[in-house]
Amino acid sequence: MDGLVAQCSARLLQQEKEIKSLTAEIDRLKNCSYLEASPSLEQLREENLKLKYRLNILRRSLQAERKRPTKNMININSRLQELFGCAIKAAYPDLENPPLVVTPSQQPKFGDYQCNSAMGISQMLKAKEQKVSPREIAENITKHLPNNEYIDRVEIAGPGFINVHLRKDFVSEQLTNLLVNGVQLPVLGENEKVIVDFSSPNIAKEMHVGHLRSTIIGESMSRLFEFAGYNVLRLNHVGDWGTQFGMLIAHLQDKFPDYLTVSPPIGDLQAFYKESKKRFDTEEEFKKRAYECVVLLQSKNPDIMKAWNLICDVSREEFNKIYDALDITLIERGESFYQDRMKDIVKEFEDKGFVQVDDGRKIVFVPGCSVPLTIVKSDGGYTYDTSDLAAIKQRLFEEKANKIIYVVDNGQATHFQTVFAAAQMIGWYDPKVTRVAHVGFGVVLGEDKKKFKTRSGETVRLMDLLEEGLRRSMDKLKEKERDKVLTEEELKAAQTSVAYGCIKYADLSHNRLNDYVFSFDKMLDDRGNTAAYLLYAFTRIRSIARLANIDEEMLQRAARETKIILDHEKEWKLGRCILRFPEILQKILDDLFLHTLCDYIYELATTFTEFYDSCYCVEKDRQTGKVLKVNMWRMLLCEAVAAVMAKGFDILGIKPVQRM
């Protein structure tokens, strides 16, 4: 609907410009004989009337759609942008792409939101030799604001800032809607498919701390897109093909010669890999056999394929232990899946004249990229470049993805830029239609600010890290004597929630492009922007109703019958903060930076604390502790905060508990 309005508006403006041009031309003509009716002008005027009529119908339909009750939360920022966009277009119809800047206000004295477009418009008019002050422009914009249900009043401040004050009834109604219908977004990705490529460890190698970020970020990104209504395919592009499998299979044949009939007890696959690598580097005969195994693997020899599957199964079992612990959902689709497509990929690039031969290699130069892609090695083998080209084509043409997101470290940025550019160059996708993005991230550092290693200098095993987290979180809970008030089951749930929640949050709360220091002491601190603090805050909020003997059924009834009052400044601040949730999620869907959600949840928790310290939810007798009065509208605000925090935690992959 919005798109049709915009399209008609653009056509209307174009027609009006043409009418002005023709009218001016007629006025300039001195010879009266030329002033006969212009068929061109009449045709434009008739078309213009039709467009205006159609536009009015569309606008009325849009307004009716807006007023229709919805179970979903509203993105208030987006709605205000639409209003100010209409006002600016009406006030300055001749300006092309005027700036539209609407943001939440940082201080209460500046209202709830601010429109800061006037300064930019002033500069645009100045370039057209029209000198108009930003303040005059702001006044003109406000005069053209359409009638709406959101805004109570606007004020012009300073040089031309437009301060927007929301209607209290509107905010109260939206909070009631949230409580009655739950935390729901409008369906943004209906019939759209998103592929998220993340984790991607190598077969026969253990997952280490380097895989942590991709796994955590990719899972959270997938959950966000699913919540927004997209059909999400989570792919684990494991390294399950290549020359290293030749040495692994040859070593398996030597160590477990009866592997075809008796399942080999490989056990420690990491040690098995190191043994085979040592032999590959030192034994020439073994190296020769390893290469022969690679050739047999590529030709799908049944015995060699069984050995390959055995090795993959052992790895998969170890990976799944970590995925189960962290509640990660993935579909494995490794490099082997794309092997049969490689030949056609090379042929397509050759047929279109993009391939050059360099020292026996087949390479592809991509405009704007400094390093060419190598799609065939000098020995005739394929490369990661070929594999990734085959993967992106399969995802675009067979999966029919609308968005593809690769969650891979910053070190691969140049590689992916080149692969994406090559896919565009050959015509596989148009970036204006299909979004293909590399979600890069920095490395995990130790407290010495160097790459996170064990004391012996080895890479930290991810399973060891998770077990250390469990131990430390239990120590923290016992230090706070929670073991004396929680049941054994509750204590175990709290231990897992804190351990894994803190590890995930410490990662996600940092700007992903930056390196971050891994510190259990910091992440388990229950002060500041940490999962420990937020999980404790959540359990405290959930306990307020319980301690006042108010159950879920009573809260649901109150949500339908009790108006949420927002007269106290802290009530108003909290109510507005709760309703910013959809605009926060929209921002992340646009820029793919999850730390924004962490910052928001922390802001929500601290805003709640301000509210709770200033506004009594439950009034008790100071001597007996007996509940004298329950301010139900405030209890409902508590529940709204908890509902939004719970959904935020869910997107981040964190499992809160009711008691801690």
Swiss-Prot record:
Gene3D superfamilies in the cross-refs: Arginyl tRNA synthetase N-terminal domain (3.30.1360.70), HUPs (3.40.50.620), Isoleucyl-tRNA Synthetase, Domain 1 (1.10.730.10)
Keyword field contains Transmembrane: no
Residues at which L-arginine binds: S200, P201, N202, H211, Y384, D388, Q412
Origin superkingdom: Eukaryota
Keyword ATP-binding: yes
Keywords: Acetylation, Aminoacyl-tRNA synthetase, ATP-binding, Cytoplasm, Ligase, Nucleotide-binding, Protein biosynthesis
N-acetylmethionine modified-residue sites: M1
Enzyme Commission number, as recorded: 6.1.1.19
Region Interaction with tRNA: start-end pairs: 529-543
Motif segment ('HIGH' region): 201-212
Chain residue ranges for the region called Could be involved in the assembly of the multisynthetase complex: 1-72
UniProt-listed SMART domains: Arg_tRNA_synt_N, DALR_1
Gene Ontology terms: biological process: arginyl-tRNA aminoacylation
Tissue and organ distribution: Detected in dorsal root ganglion.
Pfam family, one: tRNA-synt_1d
GO terms assigned for molecular function: arginine binding; arginine-tRNA ligase activity; ATP binding; tRNA binding
Catalytic activity: tRNA(Arg) + L-arginine + ATP = L-arginyl-tRNA(Arg) + AMP + diphosphate
Cellular component, GO annotation: aminoacyl-tRNA synthetase multienzyme complex; cytoplasm; cytosol; nucleolus; nucleoplasm; nucleus
Annotated compartments: Cytoplasm; Cytoplasm, Cytosol
Reported function: Forms part of a macromolecular complex that catalyzes the attachment of specific amino acids to cognate tRNAs during protein synthesis. Modulates the secretion of AIMP1 and may be involved in generation of the inflammatory cytokine EMAP2 from AIMP1.
Subunit structure: Interacts (via N-terminus) with AIMP1 (via N-terminus); this stimulates its catalytic activity. Interacts (via N-terminus) with LARS2 (via C-terminus). Monomer. Part of a multisubunit complex that groups tRNA ligases for Arg (RARS1), Asp (DARS1), Gln (QARS1), Ile (IARS1), Leu (LARS1), Lys (KARS1), Met (MARS1) the bifunctional ligase for Glu and Pro (EPRS1) and the auxiliary subunits AIMP1/p43, AIMP2/p38 and EEF1E1/p18. Interacts with QARS1. Part of a complex composed of RARS1, QARS1 and AIMP1.
Family: Belongs to the class-I aminoacyl-tRNA synthetase family.
Domain free text: The alpha-helical N-terminus (residues 1-72) mediates interaction with AIMP1 and thereby contributes to the assembly of the multisynthetase complex.
Protein's name in the database: Arginine--tRNA ligase, cytoplasmic
